[in-house]
Amino acid sequence: MNCNILNLRHLTVLLILCTAFLGGAIPAFAQQGGKKMTGQVIDENKEPMIGVSILIVGTSTGTVTDFDGNYTLNVPKDSKELQFSYVGYETKVITIPVNSNVLNVQMKSDSQVLSDVVIIGYGTQRKSDLTGSVASVGTKDFNKGMVSSPEELVNGKIAGVQIVNGGGSPTSVSTIRIRGGASLNASNDPLIVLDGVPMEVGGSISGGGNFLSLINPNDIESMTVLKDASSTAIYGSRASNGVIIITTKKGSGSDIKVSFQTTNSIATKTKTSDMLNTDKFINIVNQYGTEHQKSLLGNYRTNWNDEIYQTAFGTDNNLSVSGLALPWLPFRVSTGMYYQDGILKTDNTKRFTGNVNLTPSFFHNELRFNIGLKGTYSKNRFADTDAIWAGSTLNPTIPVYSGNDTFGGYNEAIDANGVPVTGALANAVGRLNQYDSTSDVYRFIGSASVDWNVKWVKGLRLHTTGGYDWSKGKGHIYVPKEAVSYYTTGGRDYTYGPQKNYNKLLTIYANYHNDFDAIHSGIDVTVGYDYQFWKYTTPFYAILSADGVQQSTSAATDQRHSLMSYYGRLNYTFMDRYLLTATMRRDGSSRFASDNRWGTFPSVALAWRVSQEHFFEPLRTVMNDVKLRVSYGITGQQDGITNYGYIPVYTPGLDGAQYLFGGNPIYTYRPEAYNPELKWETTKSWNYGIDLAFLENRFTFSADFYTRKTENLLATVPMPAGTNFDKLMLQNVGNVDSKGLELSVTGHIINTKNWSWTASANAAWQKVRIKNLTLTPGAPSPDTEVGPWIDAYQMQVFSTDYAPYSFYLYKQLYDAETGQPIEGLYADLDGDGEITNKDRYHHHSPAPDWILGFSTSLRYKKWTLSTSLRANIGGYIFNGMAMNTGAWETMSYNDYQLNNLNRSFLDTRFTKRQFLSDHYLENASFLKMDNLQLSYDFGRIYKTIGLHASAMVQNVFTVTKYKGVDPETANGVDTSVYPRPRTYSITIGLNF
């Protein structure tokens, strides 16, 4: 496949067409007149309704009612009708009065229709017509507060979606899993689609920290999650791990609106590693230490955590302007500035964003454009996170500073010759202050789409989108040569990057929608073509000491891959109660050889709206909607693997493989292992669901049960020595099975003028098992050790019939009288009289059995109190921090330094670390209150100026039996956690 088919010329042509249409249409529409419609919307009790959607029929132009139920909308001259809609109420379409500018409306409760529109792949669909497992969260239900990245908006809001933040740093990267992920070695990250442009799965950029955080959360209108094969198969080979569709805010058809919001916060540390306090440390050294170790005790009482952590300031400021620039040109322009200090000193990030959305339409909405431009600049300062380990384990009886200028004035472990001791812990404060690592990251995302409703073919719509996602990241690291942390290499002073990423997209599809009343049928057909091209480049750079001496090098890279796709979807509705969805996508990837390049990914789904049957009529006063769903589909996987794994590739040997010729070092090239038989990893899944709505749609309930089987896993497996240039090779090997249950319930419990109360809860159970890890089905599958390393040990394995990353440990034996673990004594599980690797056993996994979420909002007049909570039930974590700092041997690794001990030493009195003891495996179940917010809507404080304010606490509390810092980790092993802060913030918003 030619990776260069799509280039900027596609976008250039598309933008020229947009400009031509705009330019040609301006004269025709510039003279159009119109009028301003105003009014109030009330309910059956004649109370004002907040948030009623009002749309000019035949356009995407509209507005919503304010706190008093009032609205204002600029209506073009040729407009004939307005549509009023609200969840749980009948949608009303009313003719615009000719001789009046006022239109008041009374809404009526609707127990028959669920007309919400949900964004799906390559289009939209009525919620009542969905056959797949789809969940959507909008602006009003997003998590609030200091939100640095889009995924935080929906954490805990959607059943089956687990989001684990990488720690407390403002640049930390979240792990997102939908239904637990479907793979092992390949990517488990979901596909993210931003305004129709698929992002690179698991995308990253040098110096970028969290790549997704380069999108301003304040610009997001909704996030839709596609979970089952019926909804995801339209994305084919990138959909095995689910899809998240992000839609940004667009301009509305009302007066020009200006919105400004500022959030300012302070963040504090919550919990740090459970180490001995100074008094207990002194007592333990005096009790167990040698005379020399006792002599190393000082007279200070240094709390190293207080020295490295700080109260962190943050601010998030956003300004937007939206409305109608011209009668045919809705627009929204926004800018944002975000700054956040980390609670670890020297850690911070700044982000500046700009966003432009233009949505012009012409010829009575027959021709519509959507032009979006998003730009981001991020400036990051990365702290040396090794200071967290040092801050936990350094001797609390010594001072921070030495009193002289040696080694920057920091108190360090030095020998009799004044030389830093090899392997000794460097001063934690010195690590932070002497490590200067900064980065500059730029990102631009542009998209332009044209949507044409073909006038002479009823229901036919032609659509094309061009997208371009470009990013650049570079950074600089400086450490002075006197810094002990880099003493042996003479410090650091070098620049890396710039890495440049390119993502180009061309989408063309046709959609036909029509209702055939004579046969009680409706069809919606989409056929299309996609082409997407990615490129990543990084220049060669040298890693230098502070004096400019080369220490090592990093090779230049130029990576490219592309994906070509053809797809189609049929939605068929019969009698508004029997629903069919069939999808087919055929993908061709440049990551596979020609014989295996193309993959086909179909799906089919059926749904039955039982509540539309005549026999159900007596129940409709209570049960407003009942829908049964079933789907089956196949999705693919080719992300998370190398771009050229199927062809011979040579890699520079660089510093590790040089030869001397004529006294000069010559770099070598070595061949990489390759496999021309690589093919698609495929996932086959079934989904069974039910959707309910009752009591006039005030309560909704959904349940989904799914099974999933992933075959031909893309995995790196051992090879015989001397085979194919390497001992490891990427192959298609093994299967993984999973199943799960998801439950969601939402209730609009109270909705009156003075009071409203909404609540939602979700729960997800999942079970994942590895079924095979060999090329030959039925052959014995060897255990593969995986996960983080502690010293020379890994605690987790891939094993047949067990969950991925299951813990593989020795069974600790305990003293029957004291209940204390007996050092070095484990159960002889195979009964051979010896403790060997065969005595290790599979014991739990990091994955929780249940993931729960709950949120609620209570309003009294203009006051609103809201909160969100999350819980994990089951799942285990290996307390590596307790194990690795909880034995006497860790008290001192040399003759010049003492180290603090974890409080677990008081319970075990271990002399040696027990690396693989299940004593350190702890239940990681927890209950967290993520946020608690109190807000007040002042309404109009001066003519057209609206004011609202809120106060919030994030990371309010955690209830858990886990003894470490945080029970929530992405990999299940706690080696030294950057604690998540507790954040207090105040938000003030102005609208005019």
Where are the predicted features?
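Short, small/polar-rich motifs associated with maturation and membrane association
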Residues: 1-363, 367-374, 445, 680, ...
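Glycine-rich, aromatic-lined ligand/substrate-binding cores of catalytic
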Residues: 846-877
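Switch/connector loops and helix/strand junctions flanking conserved nucleotide-binding motifs
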Residues: 127-129, 202, 234-236, 254-255, ...
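Conserved small-residue
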Residues: 259-299, 644, 748-846, 961
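Extracellular/periplasmic, surface-exposed regions of secreted and cell-surface proteins
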Residues: 142, 189, 312-315, 351-352, ...
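C-terminal extracellular loops and terminal segments
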Residues: 151, 155, 728-737, 777-807, ...
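Detector for glycine-centered tight turns/loop "hinges" at secondary-structure junctions
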Residues: 46, 69, 405-408, 418, ...
